[in-house]
């Protein structure tokens, strides 16, 4: 049985960073909403309680009865998680005179404590909280503090339970990863979860689950579906048929390039031209969520049609990854935005889903692909959304707009490669805005569309920063697009980070 660590999410923006740090330590972990702890804890070796935007005293605060967890498994509370442990045990948590935010230095009171093994006294840690622990309950003891936060870290005597008021998952906490590693050692984790072990376990699981069943896989040309294809091919061979749909919203020349790439991989691929179907279904639709769902339904309908042409197809493969799953439903149950690989599926789908990568972050998918021996140019392609340019054309989607955006995007991507910038950027693309503006070309007045350029850096798509592209490069891209793409007379650059913005505009 796969051993794992569970992270209970109380709504912190850094919960996914905790998961990333644990995964980087070759340990498998899963994130669950604070109130959705699985009943079956077989294989679970420990639990981390995340931070939260709330105070423990807020009426809207997310709460669970922590006494039911204490003593059963090793437990680590971070920020709000630590304060909840104290508050529920009768200690005092009070508002800070001023919000404690930023770097500070940690003084070790008990450096021999198992959680602090190998840490240096004075190490930098990152604080971000409006409340602070002012009094510990009986049985709790301080193991580290800072100048302003004397109870920065504590343990509970007789239990494998700890709490820290700082954020070890944040990069600014210099030895945060070491502290998390110490907790994994306390949990008895083997730290042997690697791309190779994932491949071995996943291939075995796929063989057991699928048996002699046949699978069709939704190919997009991106790294996620590419890795799924190779994994499934490794597990079931010729029982896999790949379906690549041209919905008219791919990048320029994408359909032909993708078919050629997969032919080289020895995969059985069927190309389907469904442009007319998608453009007809999207006619007149402007709502972003509706566009996503229409595109999602269209994909499934096409797959169903293709499956009926084949014999005994029972499964639909998809390249869903962990950020897709997490972003599709927030902790409060409010949809942030549905993902093509998660939402938009018809209620009566004729095929069952198989999603081998649904618990991996993007960088982990890439490492698995390299371990599988896939071509680097497939593995290091920028992420591209399942709905394609459909969520980069704001407002109504038409074939004319799709052509405009394909041409603009092609210029942008080509120049990125020419200038040696492509591999320095996590994701980039052009967006066609539903905005026309006045311009002048020659002696004539124009009234045409605006294209926005987007380029971000990221580790796992859970957060992202905009890229400071050279001005000369941006000027070159702007001039090329305006001069060569009919229908565009203005180019702008998006300088928004995630959060609060998302990587895609829709």
UniProtKB/Swiss-Prot annotation:
Coiled coil: none
UniProt entry keywords in alphabetical sequence: ATP-binding, Glutamine amidotransferase, GMP biosynthesis, Ligase, Nucleotide-binding, Purine biosynthesis
Cross-referenced SUPFAM superfamilies: Adenine nucleotide alpha hydrolases-like (SSF52402), Class I glutamine amidotransferase-like (SSF52317), GMP synthetase C-terminal dimerisation domain (SSF54810)
Superkingdom of the organism of origin: Bacteria
Molecular-function annotations in GO: ATP binding; GMP synthase activity
Record-listed ATP binding positions: 220-226
Enzyme category, top tier: ligase
Keyword Ligase listed: yes
Active site per the UniProt annotation: 79, 167, 169
Pathway annotation: Purine metabolism; GMP biosynthesis; GMP from XMP (L-Gln route): step 1/1
Record field: catalytic activity: XMP + L-glutamine + ATP + H2O = GMP + L-glutamate + AMP + diphosphate + 2 H(+)
Ranges for domain Glutamine amidotransferase type-1: 4-192
Cited Pfam families: GATase, GMP_synt_C, NAD_synthase
Domain GMPS ATP-PPase as annotated: residue spans: 193-381
Single GO cellular component term: cytosol
E.C. numbers: 6.3.5.2
NCBIfam families in the cross-refs: guaA_Cterm (TIGR00884), guaA_Nterm (TIGR00888), PRK00074.1 (NF000848)
Quaternary structure (record): Homodimer.
Task of the protein: Catalyzes the synthesis of GMP from XMP.
Name used for this protein in its record: GMP synthase [glutamine-hydrolyzing]
Protein's organism: Porphyromonas gingivalis (strain ATCC 33277 / DSM 20709 / CIP 103683 / JCM 12257 / NCTC 11834 / 2561)
């Amino acid at each position: 049985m796969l051993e794992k660590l569970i992270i209970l999410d109380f709504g912190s923006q850094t919960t996914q960073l905790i998961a990333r740090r644990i995964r980087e330590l070759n340990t498998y972990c899963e994130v669950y909403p604070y109130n959705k702890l699985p009943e079956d804890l077989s294989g679970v070796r420990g639990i981390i309680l995340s931070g939260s935007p709330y105070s423990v005293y807020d009426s809207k605060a997310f709460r669970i009865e922590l006494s039911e967890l204490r003593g059963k498994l090793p437990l680590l509370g971070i920020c709000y998680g630590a304060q909840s442990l104290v508050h529920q045990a009768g200690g005092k948590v009070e508002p800070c005179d001023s919000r404690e935010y930023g770097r500070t230095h940690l003084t070790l009171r008990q450096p021999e404590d198992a959680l602090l093994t190998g840490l240096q006294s004075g190490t930098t840690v990152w604080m971000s909280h409006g409340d602070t622990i002012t009094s510990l309950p009986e049985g709790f003891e301080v193991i580290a503090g800072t100048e302003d936060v004397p109870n920065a870290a504590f343990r509970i005597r007789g239990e494998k339970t700890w709490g820290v008021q700082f954020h070890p998952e944040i990069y600014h906490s210099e030895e945060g990863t070491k502290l998390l590693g110490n907790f994994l050692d306390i949990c008895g984790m083997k730290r042997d979860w690697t791309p190779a072990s994932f491949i071995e376990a996943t291939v075995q699981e796929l063989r057991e689950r699928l048996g002699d069943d046949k699978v069709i896989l939704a190919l997009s040309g991106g790294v996620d579906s590419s890795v799924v294809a190779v994994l499934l091919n490794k597990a079931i061979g010729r029982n896999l048929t790949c379906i690549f749909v041209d919905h008219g919203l791919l990048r320029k020349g994408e359909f032909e390039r993708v078919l050629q790439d997969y032919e080289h991989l020895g995969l059985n691929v069927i190309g389907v031209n469904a442009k007319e179907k998608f453009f007809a279904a999207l006619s007149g639709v402007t709502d972003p969520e509706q566009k996503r769902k229409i595109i999602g339904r269209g994909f499934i309908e096409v797959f169903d049609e293709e499956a009926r042409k084949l014999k005994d197809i029972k499964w639909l493969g998809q390249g869903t990854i962990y950020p897709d799953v997490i972003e599709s439903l927030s902790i409060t149950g409010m949809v942030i935005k549905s993902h093509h690989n998660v939402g938009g599926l018809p209620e009566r789908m004729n095929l069952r889903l198989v999603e081998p990568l649904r618990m991996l972050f993007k960088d982990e998918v890439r490492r698995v692909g390299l371990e599988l021996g896939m071509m680097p140019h497939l593995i290091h392609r920028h992420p591209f959304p399942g709905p394609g340019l459909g969520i980069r054309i704001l407002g109504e989607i038409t074939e004319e707009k799709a052509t405009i955006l394909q041409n603009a995007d092609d210029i942008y991507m080509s120049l990125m490669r020419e200038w040696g910038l492509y591999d320095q950027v996590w994701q980039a693309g052009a967006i066609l805005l539903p905005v026309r503006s006045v311009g002048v070309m020659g002696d004539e007045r124009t009234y045409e569309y605006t294209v926005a350029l987007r380029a971000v850096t990221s580790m796992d798509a859970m957060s992202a920063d905009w890229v400071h592209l050279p001005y000369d490069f941006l000027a070159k891209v702007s001039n090329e697009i305006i001069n060569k793409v009919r229908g565009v007379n203005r180019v702008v650059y998006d300088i928004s980070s995630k959060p609060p913005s998302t990587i895609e505009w829709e």
